[in-house]
């Protein structure tokens, strides 16, 4: 799954407050070079991103739905499947801090 300019990417991380949070930004540029390959650029939140990594993380995130795990600390595409899954997990994790552990 390749993302396009205007699509959103996100990352689940713990904030300094100890709360889990979804950090997100929109892709505003996509480049392809011999040196770096295909990369996604966002306006402010994330540095240039390896597009293949983000695409693979998006696929992994979609496949994790209903399987008892979620990607944390990895950037993935936010779509109609991954966004609600991430938001639901973050709500659960912040209500169950003793059970929510970022493993992947």
Predicted stretch roles:
Residues 23-58:
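Basic/aromatic-rich interaction segments and small domains that mediate binding to polyanionic partners
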Residues 45-104:
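Intrinsically disordered, low-complexity, charged/polar segments
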Residues 3, 12, 39-40, 68, ...:
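Positively charged, low-complexity intrinsically disordered regions
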Residues 17, 40, 78-79:
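Residues in flexible loops and secondary-structure boundaries
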Residues 3-9, 30-32, 40-42, 75:
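Hydrophobic beta-strand residues in large extracellular and virion-surface proteins
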Residues 22-29, 63-69:
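Glycine-rich, flexible loop segments associated with nucleotide phosphate handling
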Residues 8, 29, 35-36, 82, ...:
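Functionally constrained cores in energy, signaling, and assembly domains
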Residues 1-21:
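Short coil-to-beta transition motif at edge beta-strands of beta-rich domains
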């Amino acid at each position: 799954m390749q993302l396009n300019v205007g699509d959103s990417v996100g990352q689940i991380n713990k904030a300094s407050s100890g709360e889990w949070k979804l950090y997100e930004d929109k892709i505003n540029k996509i480049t392809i070079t011999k040196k770096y390959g295909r990369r996604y650029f966002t306006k402010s939140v994330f540095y240039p991103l390896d597009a293949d990594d983000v695409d693979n993380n998006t696929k992994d995130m979609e496949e994790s739905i209903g399987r008892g795990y979620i990607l944390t600390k990895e950037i993935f595409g936010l779509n109609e499947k991954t966004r609600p899954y991430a938001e639901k997990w973050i709500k659960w994790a912040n209500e169950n801090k003793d059970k929510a552990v970022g493993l992947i």
